[in-house]
UniProtKB/Swiss-Prot annotation:
This is Large ribosomal subunit protein eL30. Belongs to the eukaryotic ribosomal protein eL30 family. One of its GO terms (cellular component) is cytosolic large ribosomal subunit. Keywords: Ribonucleoprotein, Ribosomal protein. Pfam families: Ribosomal_L7Ae. It comes from Lupinus luteus (European yellow lupine). GO terms for molecular function: RNA binding; structural constituent of ribosome. PANTHER family: RIBOSOMAL PROTEIN L30 (PTHR11449).
Length: 112
């Protein structure tokens, strides 16, 4: 019971930090733009939904490893990630270029 409550709390805090990035920071949404930001070494943190296709996920993780960027696996599907970003569409992956006022990069170092 306590563990489920704690994960819900951290899930909400991630959503709040993500909303702050959407307001005050710079980000890219989508697979192609995430790969572009990784190739140009602009991305600081990558967030991937849990239902991202395995080939796509492994390719993003490979580019992130080359660029030495943290990858966070979001604990929700692409609809949940899109809602957390404040969008009305599905978001499979996103790259945070500039966190703005949010401390999301310090709190989510990535699952590497």
């Amino acid at each position: 019971m306590v563990a489920a409550k704690k994960t819900k709390k951290t899930h909400e805090s991630i959503n709040n930090r993500l909303a702050l990035v959407m307001k005050s920071g710079k980000y890219t949404l989508g697979y192609k733009t995430v790969l572009k930001s990784l190739r140009s070494s602009k991305g600081k943190l990558i967030i991937i939904a849990n239902n991202c296709p395995p080939l796509r996920k492994s390719e993003i993780e490979y580019y992130a490893m080359l660029a030495k960027v943290g990858v966070h696996h979001y604990n929700g599907n692409n609809v949940d990630l899109g809602t957390a970003c404040g969008k009305y569409y599905r978001v499979c992956c996103l790259s945070i270029v500039d966190p703005g006022d949010s401390d999301i990069i310090k709190t989510l170092p990535g699952d590497q």
